[in-house]
């Protein structure tokens, strides 16, 4: 593709990704094509929900820090630490009792169980949003600055070791998962609240 084609694609992609934050005619066009036609969504999301999604996407850990302060006391993490420790003990006992597994395979499984990472509730170190400039009344500009902020953050990590303490989702996300690549299980604070836990 030539440079003009690439520029046109980048401009179209920018408008498409920013459409939910633009004036209503862009929101409507985006909904009609992306959400209704392509995804079958029967109605557009309300404006306030789009706003919450935008802020959550840009400053998820800042919101998460407040969420944790309000809804995730230290004893909740301690209870979960104990529960997971008991699960690991039970898994270790079951592993030792397996008669179909060779001694070499058991040794590998034991090592994997012992090396099992655990993230409970929230990151130990919160992300710093101090360099992100937010201006009241400038949603589009804020979105562009947020993109730049994220780009700079990712670029600053190039060539450096992977941060094993970084979380893939925010504390206020209702989810839990096992990451097989990192051999870790993650329980964000929100999944450890009633009615889920």
Residue positions per predicted region:
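Second-shell loop/turn segments in exported
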Residues: 69-81, 94-99, 173-174, 195
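Short amphipathic alpha-helical coiled-coil/interface segments
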Residues: 80-95, 109-120
């Amino acid at each position: 593709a030539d440079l003009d084609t690439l520029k046109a694609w980048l401009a179209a992609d920018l408008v498409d990704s920013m459409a939910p934050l633009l004036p209503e005619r862009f929101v409507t066009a985006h909904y009609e094509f992306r959400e209704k036609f392509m995804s079958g969504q029967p109605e557009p999301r309300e404006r306030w929900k789009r706003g919450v999604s935008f802020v959550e996407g840009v400053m998820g850990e800042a919101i998460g820090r407040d969420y944790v302060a309000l809804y995730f006391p230290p004893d909740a993490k301690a209870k979960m630490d104990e529960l997971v420790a008991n699960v690991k003990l039970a898994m270790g006992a079951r592993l030792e009792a397996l008669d179909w597994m060779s001694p070499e395979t058991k040794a590998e499984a034991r090592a994997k169980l012992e090396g099992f990472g655990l993230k409970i509730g929230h990151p130990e170190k919160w992300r710093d949003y101090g360099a992100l400039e937010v201006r009241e009344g400038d949603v589009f500009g804020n979105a562009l600055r947020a993109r730049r902020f994220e780009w700079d953050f990712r670029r600053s990590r190039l060539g450096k070791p992977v941060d094993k303490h970084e979380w893939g989702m925010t504390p206020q996300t209702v989810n839990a998962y096992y990451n097989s690549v990192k051999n870790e299980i993650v329980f964000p604070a929100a999944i450890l609240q009633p009615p889920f836990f």
